[in-house]
Amino acid sequence: MTKPIPRIGSRRNGRIGSRKSGRRIPKGVIHVQASFNNTIVTVTDVLGQVVSWSSAGTCGFRGTRRGTPFAAQTAAGNAIRTVVDQGMQRAEVMIKGPGLGRDAALRAIRRSGILLSFVRDVTPMPHNGCRPPKKRRV
């Protein structure tokens, strides 16, 4: 009979590697992706390594409430709270998408006390690329 393979890193063992929470990050980039259904806020360092992230879904909002401005504000506050504790003082903001949470997320970032170098809209715009889907008839 074969021997059972020892399970390395099962769910009960918890996290195997240590989290990089001890790093000091003075400057970073805050990416806000605001769709009509959800808002995702990702905070990275200057090299692009993800330091913290949050979304309206992980903050406990479900269904259509995930696309609301209040959900975006909560998600931005959660993502930024951890990096402010790690010492972030300056940040650049990249906003992508047409969602309702764009302005609310930016307002929450401004209120957090981080100095913003610039705010840039990086929503992808086609230069007459693919044909869009047909219009809905309700």
Curated annotation (Swiss-Prot):
InterPro entries: Ribosomal_uS11, Ribosomal_uS11_bac-type, Ribosomal_uS11_CS, Ribosomal_uS11_sf. It comes from Liriodendron tulipifera (Tuliptree). It is found in: Plastid, Chloroplast. Disulfide bonds: none annotated. Coiled coil: none annotated. GO terms for cellular component: chloroplast; ribonucleoprotein complex; ribosome. The gene is rps11. Its main location: plastid. Pfam families: Ribosomal_S11. This is Small ribosomal subunit protein uS11c. SUPFAM superfamilies: Translational machinery components. The keyword Kinase does not apply. HAMAP family: Ribosomal_uS11. Part of the 30S ribosomal subunit. Belongs to the universal ribosomal protein uS11 family. GO terms for molecular function: rRNA binding; structural constituent of ribosome. Residues 9-24 have a biased composition (Basic residues). Keywords: Chloroplast, Plastid, Ribonucleoprotein, Ribosomal protein, RNA-binding, rRNA-binding. PANTHER family: 40S RIBOSOMAL PROTEIN S14/30S RIBOSOMAL PROTEIN S11. Residues 1-24 are annotated as: Disordered. GO terms for biological process: translation.
